[in-house]
Amino acid sequence: MIFIIIFGEKMINNLHKYILPFVLVSLGSNMFAQDNKANQNDVEEVVVVGSQIKGASISGALPVSVLSSEDIEALGVDSGDELLAQIAENGANYYNEQDWNGGVNGARGDVGSFNIRNLGTGNTLALINGRRLVQNPSYQTELIGGSYVPVMSVNSNNIPIGGVDRVEILKDGASAIYGADAVAGVVNTVLKKEFEGFNIKARLAAYDHFSTEDNKVSIEFGTDLNDGRTNLGIFFDYYDRGEINANEDPRWADGDWAYKNLDLGPFQGSFRNSSNQGIFGKFYTYGTKKKAWSFYPAGAGKCNQSSAIDLGAAGCLEDSTSSTDRPRTNLNEDRAVRSQLERVNFFVYLNHEMQDGSELFTEIGAYSADSGPRNLYQQSTLGASSTCTSNIQAMIIPAENFYNPLDSDLCKDDYRFPNKPISSTALNTYRLLQGVRGSYDNGWDYEAAFVWSKAYSRNVVENRIGMDLLALALADQTAAAFNPFHGGVVPSNIERTWVDVYRKNETDLLMIDFKLTNNDLFELPGGSAGMLLGYEYREESFADMRDPRLNGTISWTNPWGETYPFVSAVANSSPTPNSSGEREVTSIFAELQMPVMDNLDIQLALRHEDFSDISETATVGKFAFGWQLHEKLLFRGSYQTAFRAPNLVTVFESVVARNNTRSDSLGRYVGDGSDIKDPNDPDTTLFDISRSVQRVARGSADLQPEESTNYSVGFVIDPIENLTIIIDKWEIEKEKSIGLFGEVNHTTLDLLMRLQGGASECVGNPAVERSPADPATAPFFAAAGLCNAGEVIRINDIYTNLDTRIIGGTDLAILYDFYTNFGDFGIKYQHSRTDEFSQTAGGNAATIVSASEAGLLPGIAVQGFSDLIGVDGNFEDKSVITAFWDYKAYRISYSSTEVGEFEESGIRRSDGTKWIIPSMQTQNITFSYNFDIADNPARLRFAVRNLEDKRAPLADETYGYYSKTHSDYGRNYYLELRVKL
């Protein structure tokens, strides 16, 4: 019973799977017929991520980048996401605190994602000490194909920076070595071991432009016990980061950059991220679009019109849709760009050598982070439109409302609630590993380990609007009713509608593995061949638990009868059911390393994986070679296949509706790129071509795994002593990428089908649901030769396997160390260039691409199926430089990171003019001095980060910069003291 309580009934039922590897250890002893107790040799761990064979000679020929602890200190990073940003091969960070486009569906809090090769979140395998990390508990969506698809990643901030010995990046993938899903590569964080001593490190950071301070305390403790047979190590990091508010920076503070800049040329109309929705809204007489009323502040010119209705100090209602005198809402005001954060990373290892020479090793890790409270922007309801009946969350103000000045029901259009929600997020991750390693007398080594890890997240947003409570407050005929016409100067009574909305997530990882290795299996002309045989079993699961007003437990029905699962009871949030799922993966794998000649090493690897939730199995392989053509020239290459099963969310998620503002290609075609206006009243819109559209998608067990090939070929050149030059050409070709056709593409297909059918084709694409056609728009559609149609209400899409995605490029690294009477010098330059990144169109995507190329869809762009290189964070170039000078008690370190330019496609002009976000380089310099404090070695360090005070280039984003690739905090400093006790 105790075991069932601790481990769960499922684990007990599968106990044979967990025991099997340890049984194999015993069988191995009998198989080799050796006395393991007689072997007192030291046990050696695997130290190279490119091969799991100890002492493998092929390891030097594999494309592995390494960031040492000295490199990491020179970079001065405080967290895992900052560390990944300094890796040349890592791309955009889609899990970042400044990107809140996903709302409650985003991965909030102290999160960062792995994205080697910029292939996308979820394509990189993250390890710690050679074994998997649990996925971040909350997930979000990323654009794949034509719309947004759920993606999962390990949280990079789980990495205990203070205990890191080095970070290894295996760039040619490693599916056959570590897991079939290692498509883009592997990031292995190796923590310090066999540590002795007691170090305390304290850091204080400050900024040129902001009043906040960051504080960090790190403790390292290690000691030998049991006459040196046991080593205990403890690493502890505490990080306290202050909030930075948007009001502290002029660019962040106001989202409307259009009026501030006179040099934007053809982009003058862009960069306006304020909103025409505000507390002064626009209202329509319910049931018709013929009568429109706008709410203006007191003193506005419209209030002098004879048709204006005086609302006293709050303002007036006037018979117009004009927004000329209505103030726009600055969504950035009093928002935190960076929230208050407290983070703790804790890691313990215990290594113990047994009497028989084997070693027990234990790892215990814990991570916690509390961020917030953080103000969000003022919110509205979903589906604002002049067509009230097409609004998912229509806000109807009954005629009986105490504050309604008219004798009819009103439907709101451009309106935001006066309050700002407040978000707080707590993250926790725990990890336990227990393993044993040893050696047999005949040269075989064994290692087995059990890993359990669990991650939790809880996000709570206060002061959200409950739609059920809002309906009651609007229907109130007393002075306690909600007053939409408050104008910010009289009470609104909005508090009666407030609710707290939560999202709770969990992920689990349970894994057990067993490996046998022998680096002296048989002799070849070049030396001894090595081999690894292994078995791995793992269970992964996730649970996404939503607030009752989001998951349908508390429902709300809109005025035309729609309810859950298409409508939620929280304003401005789409409905989301609770979801959960689990997967069991069983793997067997082998690796063979053969020095076939003195100057030629070959690596062969094979891995087979079986999945419990999909019908297909995976067999992937790898071939790599290192050919020493000359003592100063190594020619190397590799080819491997990978197999990435659909992530758990895309398999187990049920019906999920999401509202996003999207362009309707049909309306764009009929309106010649503009909204269709009433010819008798230009202020009245008959057909919105860009509006809030609901997309309904669902998980599918029929999804096929993504399959990919990864190859690299290159040279390692050592022209002179201590100088190494590395050049690698690489390419990844991935088939069956999981994505969505997308809302805009569905409307484009709808347009194409109607064009092909002519005026008699009134159905079009069945995936597109439209409101009843307005007779007033019939002449416009007839002029275009099309059947009259209404605005888009809903688009039904499913996760599907798309066609081929290809990415490729070149890596360059130059490493040089030299030693003089004036000190030791070292420099490392790494550059990663992406030459190709494209998503091939297939199926319906190919149909609309062909039609576009034939000129049948003028002015209509196909979304997500094209050349992706140099677009929206997919930069072509990234360079990282680290350098140092050591002389006696002094050390100076330098680092530089440069991210190349790319286009922001969302504001591309109709004539093809592009907005290019230029490259950005930041430089850091660190000064260190070693001395003694009461006979205890100490080090004082002063660092200047972003030496030239570079600010991120302008982008049409929330805070005016592209946060997925750039930081915009400017120059900052830290002072650090380390004492060895």
Each PLM stretch: what is its role?
Residues S138, R251-W257, A300-L341, F347-N351, ...:
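Surface-exposed, low-complexity loop segments enriched in small/polar and acidic residues
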Residues L83, L125, V186-K192, N199-A206, ...:
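Predominantly transmembrane beta-strands of Gram-negative outer membrane beta-barrel pores used
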Residues I159, E194-G197, N226-R229, Q355-S358, ...:
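Short loop/turn motifs that connect adjacent beta-strands in outer-membrane beta-barrel proteins
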Residues T124, I128, R132-L133, Y148-R203, ...:
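A beta-strand signature from Gram-negative outer-membrane beta-barrel systems
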Residues L62-N115, G120-G122, R131-S156, E168-S175:
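Periplasmic N-terminal accessory/gating domains of Gram-negative outer-membrane beta-barrel systems
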Residues I2-A88, R117, S156-I159, S218, ...:
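N-terminal Sec signal peptide and the immediately downstream disordered periplasmic leader
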Residues R658, G823-D932, E948:
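C-terminal beta-barrel architecture of Gram-negative outer-membrane proteins
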Residues T724, E735, D835-S838, S895-I907, ...:
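C-terminal beta-signal and adjacent terminal beta-strands/loops
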